[in-house]
Amino acid sequence: DVSEKALATAQKNATMNQVEVNFINTDILKTNDLEALPSSIFHLPSQFDIIVSNPPYVRDLEKQEIKKNVLDYEPHLALFVEDTDALLFYRKIAQLALKNLSPNGLLFFEINQYLGKETVELLQNLGFKNIELKKDIYGNDRMIKCSI
């Protein structure tokens, strides 16, 4: 995550739930290999069993659909992506996952409800397998699970 505040909250939650999680403070768009991150952060394994991401996915054209309390309290950096390349973060994270997922590893994404088909196609084109598109409680496309 690019937000130190978000990572501090995530670390607090991990500690409270007694789970060990490696959180990384970096701009994913400027990272080509997770192993190449500065070792001063902490030692990262060369491969991960699970990668989970909820990247920015709300397009500017969908901004009017966002509830006021979300717009008022959520950082816009965490919500919005340019209309011209709405799958930018998914592409980058998936490319990193191809290099850094263990052979039986899984990639999970929360997705834009309007871009389920496009996100599945992106992952298929990159070579992912066992792609599952899941719906939320309202019947909207919301999550993808896949493997390499």
Task: Explain the meaning of each model-derived region.
Residues H43-L44:
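Compositionally biased, intrinsically disordered low-complexity segments enriched in Pro/Arg/Gln/His
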Residues D1-P38, Q47-E65:
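Conserved SAM/SAH cofactor-binding pocket of Class I
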Residues N22-I24, L77-A78, E132:
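Structural signal for short hydrophobic segments within the conserved structured cores
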Residues N54, Y73, E110:
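Alpha/beta-hydrolase-fold catalytic nucleophile elbow
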Residues Y57-L88:
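Mobile active-site "lid"/loop adjacent to the S-adenosyl-L-methionine
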Residues E20, I50, E62, L71-D72, ...:
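Short, functionally important structural connectors and interaction interfaces within domains
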